[in-house]
Regions:
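Residues on the lipid-exposed face of transmembrane beta-strands in outer-membrane beta-barrel proteins
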Residues: 39-43, 74-78, 88, 135-139, ...
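Repeated loop/turn-to-beta-strand initiation elements of outer-membrane beta-barrel proteins
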Residues: 47, 83-86, 144-145, 228-231, ...
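Extracellular loop and loop/strand-boundary signature of outer-membrane beta-barrel proteins
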Residues: 57-62, 119-126, 146-149, 201-207, ...
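Predominantly the C-terminal beta-signal and adjacent terminal strand-loop region
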Residues: 226-321
Length: 321
């Protein structure tokens, strides 16, 4: 009787432990716990006041492909579970936008008040150099729970990305010297084009900080190539806390404040840059003081479409799941 009871107990232990062992093996094959090193590189886009209003116009205008910009960097990735990994990314790149992208649609309009016409006539452009670092969580929904499903065992997986980041940007814009006719990129942060930080200007916005927080959100598709290599395609959007990535946010200020707060040479450049509607395009003359230059209700953002490659190191520790 005692021997029989022991056999039944051993059989029960084996019955309960076998699924756990099988699941552990399957989980290890799917995504072992451990460290990965990799890189990403792809196309970058700025979403702000400068440029087009719609996403479709952004990508389909006939001038977009003339000046593509890119971003890339390195990453360290640690797999906590087949469905969850944490990543540390460091990236550098440039983003760009121009009101010239509205020309194609502006030509079709019959009213000067049309948004395409107004944007094109504003005549602004912007290029930002960006350094960023972010800590993000990578969530693979099809590998959450059971590892027995066909979806969980697939080499190719869709994943979601979310986290927090910190970045530094330096905005540039094209400036044409009226004396020489030479056009070049100049830094515009120190020109305070909307009066930021001007203490003698009523209602002036706070001085712009070039260091900002961001919330990265993304979606991607990755595929295992052998035991260690992984390659994927990822779209990542960075929601920022500033409306000055493109140097345009609110209203046209009285140009006298440039003379009161900047050197004579800086003031001359600032006057030319803050209101570029004087360029003979569709609307002649300058914008009235106090009229809208941008939309202060929406912060700027930027995004990337990147190829992601990383190498998974073999872990010596056992999985906890």
């Amino acid at each position: 009787m005692r021997t029989r009871s022991i056999k039944i107990l051993l059989l029960a232990l084996v019955s309960f432990s076998t699924p756990a062992i099988v699941n552990a093996q399957e989980a290890s094959n799917i995504e072992p716990r451990g460290m990965s090193l990799g890189f990403n590189f792809g196309m970058s886009d700025l979403w702000g006041d400068v440029g087009t209003k719609s996403v479709i116009d952004h990508y389909t205008n006939n001038k977009y492909a003339d000046l593509l910009h890119y971003m890339g960097g390195l990453m360290v990735r640690y797999s906590i579970h087949p469905a969850l990994a944490v990543r540390l990314d460091v990236n550098y790149g440039t983003i760009f936008a121009t009101d010239e992208w509205n020309l194609q649609q502006a030509k079709k309009q019959t009213s000067l008040a049309n948004d395409y016409v107004q944007r094109y006539a504003r005549g602004q452009d912007i290029k930002d150099n960006i350094w960023e670092t972010s800590l993000t969580f990578e969530f693979t929904p099809l590998r959450l729970g059971s590892f027995d499903s066909k979806a969980a065992k697939r080499n190719g997986q869709i994943y979601l990305l979310a986290g927090v980041g910190y970045f530094h940007y330096q905005p540039y814009s094209h400036y044409t010297n009226p004396e020489t006719g030479v056009t070049q990129l100049i830094k515009i942060a120190d020109l305070h084009l909307e009066g930021d930080g001007f203490t003698n200007m009523p209602g002036a916005p706070a001085k712009i900080s070039l260091w900002q927080l961001e919330v990265p959100l993304g979606i991607g598709y990755r595929r295992d190539i052998g035991e260690h290599l992984n390659i994927g395609l990822q779209w990542e959007w960075r929601m920022t806390m500033t409306d000055y990535l493109d140097g345009v946010s609110d209203k046209y200020i009285d140009p006298k404040y440039f003379d009161l707060n900047l050197s004579p040479s800086q003031a001359a450049i600032a006057k030319a840059q803050y209101d570029r509607t004087w360029i003979p395009k569709i609307i002649q003359g300058g914008a009235p003081v106090g009229s809208q230059r941008g939309n202060p209700g929406n912060n700027d953002s930027y995004s990337t479409i990147s190829v992601v490659v990383y190498y998974k190191f073999k872990s010596r520790s056992s999985n906890w799941w």
